[in-house]
């Protein structure tokens, strides 16, 4: 279960990075 939470966090971070790229 902990691994799943960690994976969700990394995915959220990745999505946030992609969104930032779009704004720049």
Curated annotation (Swiss-Prot):
Its main location: secreted. Disulfide bonds: none annotated. It is found in: Secreted; Target cell membrane. The keyword tRNA-binding does not apply. GO terms for biological process: blood vessel diameter maintenance; defense response to bacterium; defense response to fungus; killing of cells of another organism; regulation of blood pressure. One of its GO terms (cellular component) is other organism cell membrane. When conjugated to gold nanoparticles (LGNPs) or gold nanorods (LGNRs), this peptide has great potential in cancer-targeting delivery and photothermal therapy. The keyword Ligase does not apply. Keywords: Antibiotic, Antimicrobial, Fungicide, Hypotensive agent, Membrane, Secreted, Target cell membrane, Target membrane, Vasoactive. Belongs to the cationic peptide 04 (cupiennin) family. 05 subfamily. Monomer in solution. Small size oligomers on the lipid membranes. Antimicrobial peptide that inhibits many reference strains of bacteria and fungi. Is potent against Candida species and multidrug-resistant Acinetobacter baumannii (MDRAB). Is probably localized in the cytoplasm after being transported through the cell wall and membrane. Is able to interact with cell membranes and enter into cell plasma to activate the mitochondrial death pathway to sensitize cancer cells for apoptosis, as well as up-regulates p27 to inhibit cell proliferation. It shows very low effect on normal cells, such as erythrocytes, Hek293t cells. This is Lycosin-I. It comes from Lycosa singoriensis.
């Amino acid at each position: 279960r902990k691994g799943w939470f960690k994976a969700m966090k990394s995915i959220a971070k990745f999505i946030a990075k992609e969104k930032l790229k779009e704004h720049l």
